[in-house]
């Protein structure tokens, strides 16, 4: 069931039109004209009820409703709007009970001072208001409907101008016939009433008519129109309720409509998208009351680099003060932006040997399972230890030349002090392959008796293949490096000597291909730094 509420005010006698005869003089003074054309003939199930309120015409007779039988169905019906002011010329007083039907195409209802009740094929108009001596009130009467039909919560209030006595700018004159073949529903007509009302007011002023002075619906009677009972009121504009519009559509209403202040309308522009939806049924009516998103307040210091730098320094100072408040035991350095680590240079060093020992070549692979046994002898013999060896190999030549292996023995599992050795003695390092076969045993003699406390140095032990008889005169081009052992020593503050860091080894993956015509022998060379020989600990 759909409801619409409209209130009209009394007006003078309307003029007779040339299209219909004069009838119901004094009974139907102005009003609204609505039509309903069923799409399915006499079997349409939809029923619409329209309640119109008007001041009584001087009679104390209680409001009553009149039910009329449905007219015979005559093919498809179309909606036609007729004049909406009083009686028209061309209608005889003896019009049959089907008065209100403008021909067989549709149904036209004329609503005057005395409200009428009709029931025609899905349309029901209920009379609520004063009675009048009109042919519409003759016949069987039913009990009046409760006043609950007078309210409709889905409509907004809107001012309507009363019809002009001369018929200019009236609602009836602004309504035109619908295009042929177009079927209208009552819902569409009800929603179009608000726009038609606004247009009629403007046209009335343009033709010289003086519309009724407007006043706010909330101040007309001293109370809200929603809580005002239907009844006679002042001859001012009667508020009519219309459907709620979403916040986005409320801005499109013409300037004659009553609406929120301009400041309120501008505030609705910042609503979330859900409040600006065009679906009024899915949008809550209070969405325009929601607060808009707050714009972030920008600090003037954020606009320049100097301000940002000062703000960062202020934050660092505050954080340091908080840490000082916690106590000296909990003092932590102020948090600053992380300093990027220096880029590690991967350029090659002066020779191939140094580049391999420093890791300047990218390894081609890694071999697991190598181990190294470390021992020492001298003024005392420390316990031998066995540690894993990380072995990597390289592909540094396009030819089939052999490339050495690089083995690294990490001494960190032995503790911070490393592997303790005497100041004068011999160090033995034995390398085992994954099959636990000895690859090479290194024996290195050292003498660091003059090494001061808290200093460090290193030893590099090499094994070359040189031709026999050229041990002392063999040049670098005649020597072939076979094995290399790099040891690092450190003296503690108490003067104790130990191996620290790691031990690095170079060895060949297979036997060297030598010229069989010349005999070769191994030559061991141990080197240490000369100037300075010892360096202080960092």
Swiss-Prot record:
For this UniProt record, the keywords arranged alphabetically read as follows: Nucleus, Phosphoprotein
Pfam families assigned to the protein according to its UniProt record, in alphabetical order = Chromosome_seg (PF13889), DUF4210 (PF13915)
> Pro residues compositional bias: what residue ranges?
227-238
Q: Where is this region: Required for macropage invasion?
A: 348-430
Q: Name one GO cellular component term.
A: nucleus
Primary residence: nucleus
Comp. bias (Polar residues): 1-12, 129-141
Phosphoserine: modified positions: 254-255
Q: Which domain of life is it from?
A: Eukaryota
Region Transactivation domain 1 (TAD1): what ranges? 436-444
Task: State the protein's purpose.
Answer: Transcription regulator that may syncronize transcriptional and translational programs.
Name-wise, this protein is: Atos homolog protein B
Classification of source organism: Eukaryota, Metazoa, Chordata, Craniata, Vertebrata
């Amino acid at each position: 069931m759909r409801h619409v509420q409209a209130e009209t005010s009394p007006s003078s006698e309307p003029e007779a039109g040339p299209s219909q005869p004069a009838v119901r003089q004094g009974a139907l003074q102005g009003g609204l004209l609505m039509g309903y054309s069923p799409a399915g003939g006499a079997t349409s199930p939809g029923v619409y009820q329209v309640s119109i309120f008007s001041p009584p015409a001087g009679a104390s007779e209680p409001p009553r409703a009149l039910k009329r039988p449905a007219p015979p169905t005559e093919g498809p019906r179309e909606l036609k709007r007729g004049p909406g002011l009083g009686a028209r010329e061309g209608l005889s007083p003896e019009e049959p009970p089907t008065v209100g039907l403008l021909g067989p195409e549709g149904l036209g209802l004329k609503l005057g001072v005395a409200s009428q009740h009709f029931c025609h094929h899905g349309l029901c108009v209920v009379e609520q208001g004063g009675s009048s001596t009109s042919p519409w009130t003759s016949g069987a009467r039913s009990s009046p409907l409760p006043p609950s039909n007078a309210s409709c919560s889905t409509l907004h209030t809107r001012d309507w101008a009363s019809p002009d006595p001369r018929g200019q700018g009236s609602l009836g004159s602004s309504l035109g016939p619908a295009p042929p073949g177009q079927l209208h529903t009552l819902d569409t007509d009800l929603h179009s009433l608000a726009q038609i009302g606004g247009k009629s007011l403007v046209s009335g002023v343009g033709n010289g008519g003086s519309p009724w002075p407007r006043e706010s619906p909330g101040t007309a009677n001293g109370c809200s129109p929603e809580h005002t009972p239907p009844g006679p009121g002042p001859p001012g504009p009667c508020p009519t309720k219309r459907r709620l519009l979403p916040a986005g559509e409320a801005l499109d209403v013409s300037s004659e409509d009553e609406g929120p202040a301009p400041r309120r309308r501008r505030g609705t522009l910042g609503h979330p998208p859900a409040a600006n939806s065009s679906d009024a049924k899915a949008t809550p009516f209070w969405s325009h009351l929601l607060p808009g998103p707050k714009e972030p307040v920008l600090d003037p210091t954020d606009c320049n680099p100097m301000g940002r730098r000062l703000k960062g320094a202020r934050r660092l100072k505050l954080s340091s003060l908080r840490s000082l408040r916690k106590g000296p035991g909990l003092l932590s350095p102020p948090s600053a932006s992380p300093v990027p680590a220096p880029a590690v240079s991967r350029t090659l060093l002066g020779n191939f040997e140094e580049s391999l020992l420093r890791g300047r070549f990218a390894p081609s692979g890694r071999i697991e399972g190598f181990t190294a046994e470390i021992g020492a002898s001298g003024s005392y013999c420390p316990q031998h230890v066995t540690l894993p060896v990380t072995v990597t190999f390289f592909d540094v030549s396009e030819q089939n030349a052999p490339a050495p292996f690089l083995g690294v023995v990490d001494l960190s599992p032995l503790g911070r002090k490393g592997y303790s050795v005497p100041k004068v003695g011999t160090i033995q390092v034995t390398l085992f392959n994954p099959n636990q076969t000895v690859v090479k045993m290194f024996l290195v003699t050292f003498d660091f008796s003059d090494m001061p406390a808290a200093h460090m140095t290193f030893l590099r032990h090499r094994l070359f293949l040189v031709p026999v008889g050229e041990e002392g005169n063999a040049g670098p081009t005649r020597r072939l490096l076979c094995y290399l052992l790099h040891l690092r020593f450190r003296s503690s503050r108490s003067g104790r000597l130990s191996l620290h860091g790691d031990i690095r080894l170079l060895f060949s993956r297979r036997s060297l291909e030598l010229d069989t015509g010349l005999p070769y022998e191994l030559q061991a060379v141990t080197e240490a730094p000369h100037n300075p020989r010892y360096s202080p600990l960092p």
